[in-house]
Structure formats: structure tokens, C-alpha cells
Amino acid sequence: MASIKLDGAGASKMKTLEEALVSLQTIHGIVERMAMDVQNKKGVGVIPMQLKRIAAPLVGQLKGQFGMIADQISTMLLVAGRGGGDQVKVRAYREHVAQVRTAMETAQKKVTRDHGVEIELAPE
């Protein structure tokens, strides 16, 4: 029976993606909290600043190996600086989070395909 193991470069890329997914989950939680505040007609307060504070290091983390995903996150940060209503911002944040998550999942599959090495497992 064969199994797939990642080579060194693949393991490094996969570790970067897994850490980035944890940060993205945090961002998603903040966006949903912002959506609840907007729905309840409360002010969003410092939530856009929290998003910037979490997403900016994520851009730096991904820039070296996954530049296109980092660019998508940078675009998401630009949404925070634009004018417009909070509902429009929430919608844009949700769309960007979904795009980034899809891009990360696609990148994980690509890393597995490109850096996967088949190993033979011993029979039981």
C-alpha cells in the first residue's frame, strides 16, 4: 500500500499554508463579529483596525512563497480604507475571505501534487 509524503520544500510550504489558514480563521471570526454589529445597528468601532493588525503580518508571511494569495489579502486590506457603508464593507470582507480560503485550499492541493513523494508502507 502506498502513501504520499511531502519533500522538504513541500513540507515548508504546507506549514506556511496551515499557519495562514489559522490566521484566516481568526480574520473570518472578526468579520462575522463585524457583521453581527452591523446587523444589530451598533458601531463597528475598532474592528477594521483589528483586521488590519492581523492581516498585515499574514501578507508578509505569504509573500515569499504565495505572492498571489498575499496580494488578495492586501486587496482585502484596501477595502478597510475605502469609504462607504459598513454593510458594503462586510460584504466585501466576506467575499475576500472566501476568495483567500479557496486560493489557500487550491494551493494546498497543488503543493501535495507537486511535492508529494510516494512511499511504500510495510504490510501489517
What spans do the regions from the language model cover?
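Charged, alpha-helical coiled-coil and linker scaffolds that mediate dimerization/oligomerization
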Residues: D37-N40, Q65-M68, Q72-T75, R113-V117
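Amphipathic, coiled-coil-like alpha-helical segments
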Residues: M1-M34, D86-E124
